[in-house]
Each structure stands twice: as C-alpha cells, then as structure tokens.
C-alpha cells in the first residue's frame, strides 16, 4: 500500500486552528477557525455567547490589539494560542464625594 499525499486544493486539518479566548474573569472559550478567516467571526461569536457587545470589549493577542480584519495566519497564531479579552474602560472621572468641595473642607483654599 502506498501512502497518498493530499492533492492540491484539498482541504486538510491544517487549514483550521484551535484558539482559546480568555476573559478577565478567568473563563476560557475555545473556537476552531480557518487560518485565513477574519477574526471578526470569532469575535462576534464570542460576544454573542457571552452576551456582550463588541463595543464593550477589546481583543488582544501577545499584548497587541486585534483588528476585525486580521486573520490567524496574518498574526502568526499557532494551534492552542490564547486571545485575551478586556473590558473597554470608559470615562475616568472621580466619583462624587472624592473631590473636596468648599462646603466639606472649609480649611482649604480654592
């Protein structure tokens, strides 16, 4: 018996990659995606599964932001690599009462 080689144009298991998406809460969701499929597909599926909006979170791989048009092949991702998910930080104002006001701090000059 001779060993058959995959023919040109025939899809093999190497066309797919298994990726882990790790949330800040420690949860991990696994996805199987084609190496040349835009990661937007994975990102949208993750958001739907977790009940999140794409505007609420950011995806990073090796510390770098991931764009929706990026593919695993472009980012040189390997099987079982992990994508990190971070909640989008909005605002930055101090909470009410944390900044002294003249009524609360009569000894301070403004």
Swiss-Prot record:
Cleaved propeptide residues: 93-110
InterPro entries per record: Rad60/SUMO-like_dom (IPR022617), Ubiquitin-like_dom (IPR000626), Ubiquitin-like_domsf (IPR029071)
One Pfam family linked to the record: Rad60-SLD
Post-translational modification comment from the UniProt entry: Polymeric chains can be formed through Lys-11 cross-linking. Cleavage of precursor form by SENP1, SENP2 or SENP5 is necessary for function.
Keywords per UniProt: Cytoplasm, Isopeptide bond, Nucleus, Ubl conjugation, Ubl conjugation pathway
BP GO terms, sorted: positive regulation of ubiquitin-dependent protein catabolic process; protein localization to nucleus; protein sumoylation
Domain Ubiquitin-like: 15-92
Glycyl lysine isopeptide (Lys-Gly) (interchain with G-Cter in SUMO2) cross-link site: 5, 7, 11
Subcellular locations according to the entry: Cytoplasm; Nucleus; Nucleus, PML body
Key word Transferase present: no
Cross-link (Glycyl lysine isopeptide (Lys-Gly) (interchain with G-Cter in SUMO)): 11
Lineage top rank: taxon: Eukaryota
Chain segments carrying region Disordered: 88-110
Biased amino acid composition, Polar residues: 88-101
Cross-link (Glycyl lysine isopeptide (Gly-Lys) (interchain with K-? in acceptor proteins)): 92
Main location: cytoplasm
GO function term, MF aspect, one: SUMO transferase activity
Keyword RNA-binding assigned: no
Entry function: Ubiquitin-like protein which can be covalently attached to target lysines either as a monomer or as a lysine-linked polymer. Does not seem to be involved in protein degradation and may function as an antagonist of ubiquitin in the degradation process. Plays a role in a number of cellular processes such as nuclear transport, DNA replication and repair, mitosis and signal transduction. Covalent attachment to its substrates requires prior activation by the E1 complex SAE1-SAE2 and linkage to the E2 enzyme UBE2I, and can be promoted by an E3 ligase such as PIAS1-4, RANBP2 or CBX4.
UniProt family annotation: Belongs to the ubiquitin family. SUMO subfamily.
Name of the protein: Small ubiquitin-related modifier 3
